A protein has these predicted regions:
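Short acidic-aromatic low-complexity motifs
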Residues: 1-26
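Exposed alpha-helical structural elements
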Residues: 7, 19, 44, 114-117, ...
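Short N-terminal micro-motifs specific to bacterial/archaeal maturation
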Residues: 10-11, 35-36, 93
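Soluble or luminal CAZymes and related metallo-dependent hydrolases
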Residues: 3, 44, 86
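A solvent-exposed, acidic/Ser-Thr-rich amphipathic alpha-helical stretch
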Residues: 18, 26-71
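A beta-strand edge to alpha-helix "cap/lid" segment located at domain peripheries
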Residues: 53-136
């Protein structure tokens, strides 16, 4: 397995956000399934990925990658999870640079009721994380 992909799986397994500091390039761009405009930079991408880990991989979600397609410096990871009883099917499309750092992370989600649930839960989690970050 590619070292970058292995590190991504380690982040998911350990839920250790410090792994993202080494895994994400400073110029990384995150493409949300909800927000049209790309989110640019390491800090905002890290915030989104931590929120997604809590929402998609939280208790009773049964988050699982069901397929991986690896070609050169690109990984396509299909996943399933359950959020509030709604089955979510999605794809993480990840591109890394020559140093193995993630430079692009795009998430696609289906069906519509799953998108609506992801929108709701990610909005709540992002607000919660922003409030926690703002505390002394």
């Amino acid at each position: 397995m590619n070292a970058s992909l292995k590190n991504w799986h380690t982040f998911l397994d350990t839920k250790n956000p410090k792994i993202l500091d080494e895994l994400l390039a400073d110029e990384v761009i995150f493409y949300s399934p909800i927000v049209w405009s790309p989110q640019e930079g390491k800090q905002i991408t890290k915030l989104y990925l931590i929120a997604a880990l809590k929402v998609f991989g939280g208790e009773n979600t049964n988050f699982t990658y069901v397929r991986q397609v690896i070609e050169n410096n690109q990984f396509i990871l299909e996943f399933t999870t359950i959020i509030d009883g709604i089955t979510v099917n999605g794809v993480d499309m990840i591109e890394v640079n020559d140093e193995g750092k993630i430079i692009s992370f795009k998430v696609m989600v289906r069906p519509l009721k799953a998108i609506n649930k992801v929108h709701e839960k990610m909005g709540e989690m992002l607000e919660k994380l922003k409030l926690q970050k703002g505390k002394p």
